[in-house]
């Protein structure tokens, strides 16, 4: 089976690849940028589900176009195997902030027109934007959401070309990690809002996700929960 990750986010790709390393079946995992030129995908949906769907459709359509053209044999052979395209959209939701950052998690500082020029990268700007919003209400309950959209092409379809998108079924999986956000950053691991989020599960020391090592984080994360459902479904189908 070939799995194509519909993401150009290196942090997410690394997490997905680590989670898929111990899959019992033989699986080849590619970031879509290993097969295609990366391109901008408009994430203008109103929910994590809509954004994940936009991503999986965009990457599938690009792969479909590639499958119709003359290409190298090693690329053509990918389409002769069971093929899964996995897209994910995720974010942090804080109920006291009306669910924000939510679907704007990756661009929260920009969404809030927060002065971000003084920060070294987008993650840092987003963190300080959230800290600013939490000034009078942290610690407070919060949760991470990961939504996965899956397109799976069965082996008998895979004859060097792919079927049109209209013939594909998109399936959905969601994982949630409950916890709370605090008003100080702790830890140097992970990415995104990990330094502010304390998960409620398997965390007797009240560590932030940024204080977990990757292997420990990947046993409880929202992304792991959604991906586990997706992988179980893939092996049911294959």
Swiss-Prot record:
It holds the Pfam family Ham1p_like. GO terms for molecular function: dITP diphosphatase activity; ITP diphosphatase activity; metal ion binding; nucleotide binding; ribonucleoside triphosphate phosphatase activity; XTP diphosphatase activity. It catalyses: XTP + H2O = XMP + diphosphate + H(+); dITP + H2O = dIMP + diphosphate + H(+); ITP + H2O = IMP + diphosphate + H(+). Mg(2+) binds at residue 89. Its cofactor is Mg(2+). Homodimer. This is dITP/XTP pyrophosphatase. It comes from Helicobacter hepaticus (strain ATCC 51449 / 3B1).
